[in-house]
A protein has these predicted regions:
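An aromatic- and glycine-enriched ligand-binding surface/loop that stacks and positions planar moieties
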Residues: 21-84, 157, 214, 225-358
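Glycine- and aromatic-rich loop/turn segments at beta-sheet edges
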Residues: 156-163, 196-206, 281-288
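Amphipathic alpha-helical protein-interaction segments enriched in hydrophobic
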Residues: 209-219, 223
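Short, conserved phosphate-binding/catalytic loop or strand-edge motifs used
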Residues: 162-168, 240-243
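Bacterial Sec-dependent N-terminal signal peptides
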Residues: 1-31
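Conserved, well-structured interaction surfaces
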Residues: 38-61, 65, 80-154, 171-208
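Short, small-residue-rich loop/turn micro-motifs
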Residues: 161-166, 192, 227-229
């Protein structure tokens, strides 16, 4: 009996030893680790990497309300509610802090992903040259857009090297200080302009949330408008010029002198967007309008004759008037979801959903 017991104990100890040996054999856990070359020579993995760069536009970088189920319609600043009511009020009044939105970290994660993509996409030969150019332009747009989101919230921010940072470097080498507001805007402007060269004017329905040429040029114009505004382009009599916002060397990060050229440049950039060619009276974008009708249907009343002002009321839409449109339905359709995203001539860039918190 004792021999049987010893034999049983021996077998159990051997089994445990084998199991422990398997546990300690860590080689199998490294089989799933892939090099950048492995990722960017595989088409599916390449697209997954770009999708991950996009992903940080959600979460903490979604800034308004929580209308999660209305992805095809807009909502104006009048509407907010649900379980994010207090958070949205905080955003509206500018009283939020980093405990409310951790977009700093998420944005720089997206910037890193996009930069790596830009540096490595050219090694993938499974795409045509045109496809690679589009994908690289998307990543360039996304990276510049993260910087734009950061600039709006934090003011002057650190601009990282395009090739990234070596995390094994000393802290002093990794601690990139803020660039000036003008430097940030110039970077965003140049990157958006470069991205616009290879982005298409339109996207297919299944790619409606990807940036177009108009999206890049519009973000560029917005950044230039912010740079031209009093916050960074003060007139002599402006009381607060943010002169105490300086870098480690004491250089002021905000412009201290008014420059009229900034407004001219912003206006020209906005015009670049407005004059993009398209199928809306020769333009890519225009205000959505619904034709007037005298037929009433459930939920859709007949057109109420608009105010007769003797000018616009006598002209058609193409002539700059409103005699042949339904003003009420033209406005309502944009907000109630009856107008799909891809059909909306006003839509320049969307993240694929209307509003939404996490």
């Amino acid at each position: 009996m004792r021999k049987i017991y010893k034999l049983f104990i021996g077998i159990m100890l051997s089994a445990i030893a084998v199991a422990c040996s398997d546990k300690l054999d860590s080689d199998k856990y490294f089989k799933d680790r892939r090099s950048l070359e492995d990722v960017f020579t595989d088409k599916e993995s390449t697209e997954e990497w770009l999708a991950n760069a996009y992903s940080y536009l959600g979460g903490y970088n979604l800034e308004v309300s929580n209308m999660l189920n209305t992805i095809t319609n807009f909502a104006d600043d009048i509407y907010f509610g649900g379980n994010s009511l207090d958070a949205y009020k905080t955003f509206k009044t500018g009283t939020y802090d980093e405990s409310y939105r951790h977009s700093w970290g998420d944005s720089y994660k997206g910037i890193r992903q996009a930069s790596i993509f830009i540096q490595n996409i050219d090694m993938n030969t499974k795409y045509t040259e045109e496809e690679r150019a589009d994908l690289k332009a998307q990543a360039r747009f996304v990276r510049a857009y993260y910087y734009w989101l950061l600039l709006r919230k934090y003011g002057p921010i650190p601009l990282l090297p395009d090739e990234g940072l070596d995390y094994t470097s000393d802290y002093d080498d990794l601690a990139i200080q803020r660039s000036s507001y003008d430097e940030c805007v110039e970077y965003i402007e140049s990157e958006m302009r470069l991205a616009a060269k290879d982005l298409p004017l339109t996207r297919a329905i299944n790619q409606v949330a990807r940036p177009t040429r108009g999206a890049a040029l519009a973000a560029r114009a917005r950044a230039l408008v912010y740079s031209a505004s009093p916050i960074n382009n003060p007139r002599p009599g402006d009381p607060d010029k943010f002169s105490d916002l300086v870098d480690y060397e004491g250089n002021c990060l905000m412009s201290q002198e008014y420059n009229e050229y900034k407004w001219a440049r912003a206006a020209a950039a906005a015009r670049d967007v407005m004059e993009l060619p398209g199928e809306n009276n020769g333009h890519r974008y225009e205000l959505y309008h619904k034709k007037a009708t005298n037929i009433a249907e459930p939920g859709y009343p007949a057109t109420i004759p608009p105010y007769q002002d003797g000018d616009f009321s006598t002209k058609t839409w193409n002539e700059g008037g409103y005699s042949d449109i339904d003003p009420y339905e033209s406005y309502r359709a944009v907000f109630n979801g009856s107008l799909a995203m891809y059909q909306n001539p006003e839509l320049i860039f969307s993240r694929g959903r209307n509003q939404g918190a996490n």
